[in-house]
A protein has these predicted regions:
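Short beta-strand segments
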Residues: 7, 58-62, 82-83, 108-118, ...
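Catalytic-pocket segment enriched in acidic/His residues
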Residues: 37-50, 66, 98, 145-268
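Structural signature of FAD isoalloxazine-binding scaffolds in flavoprotein oxidoreductases
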Residues: 74-91, 107-109, 245-256
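Short helix-loop capping/hinge motifs at secondary-structure junctions, enriched
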Residues: 121-125, 177-180
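N-terminal non-catalytic cap/leader segment that marks the start of a structured domain
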Residues: 1-79, 251
Length: 268
């Protein structure tokens, strides 16, 4: 099942399934995070991020070919950083380039598979880790490269946490439709041209490994969103470098999830 969060004509925030681009069927959610289709179809007025995350945890340099294109060594352990929950944006929302990241241009795209945690996870083994996953979604780890590097090492939070810098959606595909998250095609198109075209099998650390590793230090709370790294093809490694500008259209497409689309705007 693919779950969508949205607002109705009455302004209510609800969850649905079987979204056809205009309407969706309302779903009921139980305490154990199972969903049932009510069969009642309503108009989708505004698509919302499919999750309201308690935390957004990100993993850097997690695709082998991406590490190679940046000239960096593959990490021995997952490289962890955070994005502020306030950076979340939905399908169709504008990604706004802040004034401080406009001159010179520096804002980049990063297609990523997002993982939504279902239940509290602490000291979870790799073998049981996927039992703690509710579903998967498309995300875009938008990054202001100059600000990302100010603190050095992997202290990237500020450059990746500006408002709207974490587009997410349009739906969350539940685990019953994605039994193997390491077997998904992932792409990003910029103004219709494919910039990233890869596969989750190129990940250095698997989804199960990441969840197990993260749960050893802190309890992963329900609703935690994990961004699992971006593949090769980002803008700053290109010659000449390619950065986002107002009017650009980004599309993140992940197999069996859908297409997350966002336009780029400039902060006034």
């Amino acid at each position: 099942m693919k779950i969508i969060r949205f607002t109705t004509q009455q302004g209510k925030e609800v969850m649905g399934c079987d979204w056809d681009g205009k309407t969706a069927s309302l779903v009921e959610q139980s305490e154990d995070y199972t969903f049932s289709d009510t069969g009642e179809r309503v108009e989708v007025v505004k698509v919302l991020p499919p999750v309201e995350p308690s935390a957004i945890i990100c993993i850097g340099l997690n695709y082998r070919r991406h590490a190679k294109e940046t000239g960096q060594e593959i990490p021995k352990y997952p490289a962890i950083f955070m994005k502020y929950p306030g950076s979340l944006a939905g399908h169709g929302d504008a990604v706004v380039i802040p004034k401080c990241a406009s001159d010179p241009p520096e804002v980049d795209y990063e297609a990523e598979l997002g993982v939504v945690i279902k239940k509290a996870a602490k000291n979870v083994s790799e073998e049981e880790a996927l039992d703690y996953v509710l579903g998967y979604t498309c995300t875009n780890d938008v990054s202001a490269r100059r600000w990302q590097k100010h603190a050095g090492a992997f202290q990237w939070t500020r450059g990746k946490s500006y408002d709207t810098f974490c587009p997410c959606g349009p739906v969350m595909t539940l685990t019953d439709e994605i039994p193997d998250p390491q077997n998904l095609a992932i792409k990003l198109r910029l103004n219709g041209e494919t910039m990233q075209d890869s596969h989750t099998s190129d990940m250095v650390f698997s989804i199960a490994n990441m969840i197990s590793y993260l749960s050893q230090s802190s309890t992963l709370l329900p609703g935690t969103l994990i961004l699992t790294g971006t593949p090769e093809g980002v803008g700053f490694t290109r010659k000449p470098r390619l950065y986002l500008k107002p009017g650009d259209r980004m599309e993140v497409e992940i197999e069996n999830i859908g297409v997350l689309e966002n336009l780029v705007e400039q902060e006034e």
